[in-house]
């Protein structure tokens, strides 16, 4: 996989995250915990825009981001999908441990232990993945691009 093809994959993921978020927005009022469903909608759209921006930078601006870094970024986008989908499930589960502020507003009593674990692991993985991906992006742009000597 080249940096260019990986960047296109990131762009497609970003576009799909936004699309899924927009469609999911139609479902939000029909879930047991609409406030938690709204959180999933926001995660899809916001993270989709984040990956669109990341991919656009990689495709349009000179940089020194390598193939390995792009692979890490692709892992981060897959972890982001897992996190956003865990929030979709949470609109029915009503877990409270990982997102206590949203849960306090939504009023759930908590999910089963396995549900709480899925939501927790998905959020931790995506959070760490996003931090690493953006750190690699920053480093790749701070280094001088090959044509800038």
Q: What spans do the regions from the language model cover?
A:
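Juxtamembrane membrane-water interface segments of multi-pass membrane proteins
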Residues: 1-9, 27-36, 53-74, 90-99, ...
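Individual transmembrane alpha-helices with interfacial aromatic-anchor signatures
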Residues: 109-130
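Membrane-interface interhelical loops and short amphipathic "cap" helices
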Residues: 26-42, 98-114
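Hydrophobic cores of alpha-helical transmembrane segments in multi-pass integral membrane proteins
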Residues: 10-27, 38-58, 74-90, 124-139
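N-proximal short alpha-helices
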Residues: 9, 16-18, 54, 104-111, ...
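Eukaryotic low-complexity, intrinsically disordered regulatory segments enriched in serine, proline
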Residues: 87-107, 120-124
